[in-house]
C-alpha cells in the first residue's frame, strides 16, 4: 500500500481501515466462495459474481488506496468495505431464501395489473 495512511475518513462513525486491501480481499473472496453454493442459472449469482470478481481484481492490481477508491467508484475505501460486508450478509440471506426456486403457490390472477 503506497502513501501515508489517512487519519480520518471525514465521515462520522466510520473509522479508518489500516489494511483495506487485505480486508477487501477477504470479503470479496468470502462472497465468491458463498456464491458457488448458488445454482449457476441464478441471476443473483451471475451478476454478483461478475461484479465481485472485477472488484477483487482491482484490489489485487492497484496498491495505492486513493487510486483504488477512484477505480472502485464507491466513495472512501472504508465505505467500499462496508458495502462488501453488506453484500456478504445479503448473499448469506439469499442462500437461505432460495429465490431461484419456483413459487410455493401461484400468484392470484391480475396481481400485477395496474390500475385495478
Swiss-Prot record:
Record's GO cellular component terms: mitochondrial inner membrane; protein-containing complex; respiratory chain complex I
GO biological process terms, semicolon-separated: respiratory electron transport chain
InterPro entries named in the record: NDUFA5 (IPR006806)
Location of this chain's protein in the cell: Mitochondrion inner membrane
Domain of life: Eukaryota
Residues modified as N6-acetyllysine: 30, 46, 60, 98
Keywords linked to the UniProt accession: Acetylation, Electron transport, Membrane, Mitochondrion, Mitochondrion inner membrane, Phosphoprotein, Respiratory chain, Transport
Residues with the N6-succinyllysine modification: 98
N-acetylalanine: modified positions: 2
Phosphoserine sites (modified residues): 89
Family that this chain belongs to: Belongs to the complex I NDUFA5 subunit family.
Subunit structure: Complex I is composed of 45 different subunits.
PANTHER family (UniProt xref): NADH DEHYDROGENASE [UBIQUINONE] 1 ALPHA SUBCOMPLEX SUBUNIT 5 (PTHR12653:SF0), NADH-UBIQUINONE OXIDOREDUCTASE 13 KD-B SUBUNIT (PTHR12653)
Full protein name: NADH dehydrogenase [ubiquinone] 1 alpha subcomplex subunit 5
Organism of derivation: Rattus norvegicus (Rat)
Amino acid at each position: 500500500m503506497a502513501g501515508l495512511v489517512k487519519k480520518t475518513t471525514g465521515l462520522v462513525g466510520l473509522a479508518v481501515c489500516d489494511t483495506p486491501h487485505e480486508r477487501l480481499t477477504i470479503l470479496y473472496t468470502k462472497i465468491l466462495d458463498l456464491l458457488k453454493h448458488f445454482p449457476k442459472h441464478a441471476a443473483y449469482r451471475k451478476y454478483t459474481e461478475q461484479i465481485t470478481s472485477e472488484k477483487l481484481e482491482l484490489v489485487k492490481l492497484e496498491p495505492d488506496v486513493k487510486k483504488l477508491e477512484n477505480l472502485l467508484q464507491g466513495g472512501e475505501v472504508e465505505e467500499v468495505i462496508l458495502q462488501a460486508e453488506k453484500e456478504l450478509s445479503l448473499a448469506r440471506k439469499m442462500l437461505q431464501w432460495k429465490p431461484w426456486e419456483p413459487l410455493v403457490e401461484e400468484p392470484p390472477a391480475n396481481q400485477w395489473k395496474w390500475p385495478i
